[in-house]
């Protein structure tokens, strides 16, 4: 059974990453899950358990992305980016830092996928219009994609990884935020410093800001633009209310997304059908299918091996526990994708005989490693693969070798500093 469960997992993962002839990841994951069920690797009760675990996470994620797609069509993100350019006042280094800050804000509220896939094309178009060379464009593109993941820690909704882990361990919105806001600030500061050190010679010191258009010119629907701010406030309140009422956060995000869609349906700035079609619905199928496949590893006893490793690491104290878990999840994410990684690690943490603050350290370090680790390799997350594809369509080609060389140098120090932020949070607060 161990061999069969492992084989099903590896083959499913291979096809998810390979996507031959555009094979949808949701179909691939469900096929793997179906094989796992008919071969007896997982039971029907496991299927119901998995559905109960991931439905809230995936629907929340889809709802947030839907909202972000509408905001993108309205022009909110481009409006924000233009403001950042004007605030830079022709200083290239300031512009670099401000773009990173904008990416961090977008990632926090609209998830890492939304930040990377929506903000990157906007930034790319802007630096091209300014007249930057290909060498000068590269740092801004990498920074836009990198910061989307490294600062997707503060809110449960900032990353699908966060939602799944929080749901699995029944962590509320406020409790999660209180533990991850400081690590996220550490990650943001470390990202700015490390990215600047790495790209300092390629970033232009000055640029001509005379031809930058006015922020209001980016707004495609003024009425909907104003409504957007109200939607954002209501969305934040929805997150808080879900904490106290114990109503699944997907209910709030789903209702808000639906109302926003209805308000936007008569706007000339967007096509509602295209927006709905553009939402990552396949993530729902992928999450359920992949989780079922991972449950096969649990049933075969493979996750128990990892649980024993975590118990061993925890014997050396909180600092070693956090660093060990963080780098284990980062490494696994980089070689087999962060979605199955966070699932496997969460199950192993639950199975381990680790309690109290040490267990809390494992839980949050797993999230940090699974959020940041994917930046080491192109296959670390599905969003990165899609991000690279979008860039290729826009005539910006980044080879896997170039990505890996850049990713590993930038990610390791940022990951280490972020984990230190988590350690300080747990021992001080």
From Swiss-Prot:
It is a multi-pass membrane protein. Keywords: Arsenical resistance, Cell membrane, Membrane, Transmembrane, Transmembrane helix, Transport. GO terms for molecular function: arsenite transmembrane transporter activity. The chain crosses the membrane at residues 3-23, 25-45, 50-70, 99-119, 137-157, 180-200, 222-242, 244-264, 275-295, 316-336, 372-392, 408-428. One of its GO terms (cellular component) is plasma membrane. InterPro entries: Arsenical_pump_ArsB. GO terms for biological process: response to arsenic-containing substance. CDD domains: ArsB_permease. It is found in: Cell membrane. Involved in arsenical resistance. Thought to form the channel of an arsenite pump. Belongs to the ArsB family. This is Arsenical pump membrane protein. It comes from Staphylococcus aureus (strain MSSA476).
């Amino acid at each position: 059974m161990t061999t069969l469960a492992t084989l099903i997992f590896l083959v499913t993962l291979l096809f998810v990453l390979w996507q031959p002839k555009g094979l949808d990841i949701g179909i691939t994951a469900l096929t793997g899950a179906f094989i796992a069920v008919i071969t007896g690797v997982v039971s029907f009760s496991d299927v119901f358990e998995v559905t109960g675990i991931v439905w809230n996470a995936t629907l929340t994620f889809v709802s947030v992305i839907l909202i972000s797609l509408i905001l993108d069509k309205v022009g909110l993100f481009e409006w924000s980016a233009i403001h950042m350019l004007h605030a830079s006042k022709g200083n290239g280094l300031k512009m670099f830092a401000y773009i990173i800050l904008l990416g961090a804000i977008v990632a926090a509220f609209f998830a890492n996928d939304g930040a990377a896939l929506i903000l990157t094309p906007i930034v790319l178009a802007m630096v091209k219009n300014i007249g930057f060379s290909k060498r000068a464009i590269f740092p801004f593109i990498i920074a836009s994609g990198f910061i989307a993941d490294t600062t997707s820690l503060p809110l449960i909704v900032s990353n699908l990884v966060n939602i799944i882990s929080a749901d699995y361990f029944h962590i509320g919105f406020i409790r999660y935020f209180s533990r991850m806001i400081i690590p996220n600030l550490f990650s943001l500061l470390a990202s700015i410093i490390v990215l600047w050190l790495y790209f300092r010679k390629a970033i232009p010191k000055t640029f001509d800001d005379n031809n930058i258009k006015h922020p209001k010119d980016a707004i495609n629907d003024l009425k909907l633009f104003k409504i957007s701010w109200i939607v954002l406030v209501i969305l934040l309140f929805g997150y808080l209310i879900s904490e106290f009422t114990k109503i699944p956060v997907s209910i709030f995000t789903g209702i808000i997304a639906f109302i926003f869609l209805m308000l936007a349906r008569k706007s000339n700035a967007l096509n509602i059908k295209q927006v709905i079609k553009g939402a990552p619905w396949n993530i729902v199928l992928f999450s359920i299918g992949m989780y079922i496949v991972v449950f096969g590893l649990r049933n075969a006893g493979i996750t128990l091996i990892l649980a024993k490793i975590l118990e061993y690491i925890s014997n050396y104290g909180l600092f070693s526990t956090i660093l060990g878990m963080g780098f284990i999840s980062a490494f696994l994410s980089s070689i087999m994708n962060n979605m199955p990684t966070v699932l496997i690690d969460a199950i192993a943490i639950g199975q381990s005989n680790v309690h109290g603050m040490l267990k809390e350290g494992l839980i949050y370090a797993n999230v940090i490693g699974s959020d940041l680790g994917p930046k080491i390799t192109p296959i670390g997350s599905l969003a990165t693969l899609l991000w690279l594809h979008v860039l290729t369509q826009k005539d910006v080609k980044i080879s896997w070798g170039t990505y890996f060389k850049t990713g590993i140098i930038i990610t390791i120090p940022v990951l280490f500093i972020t984990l230190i932020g988590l350690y300080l949070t747990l021992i001080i607060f």
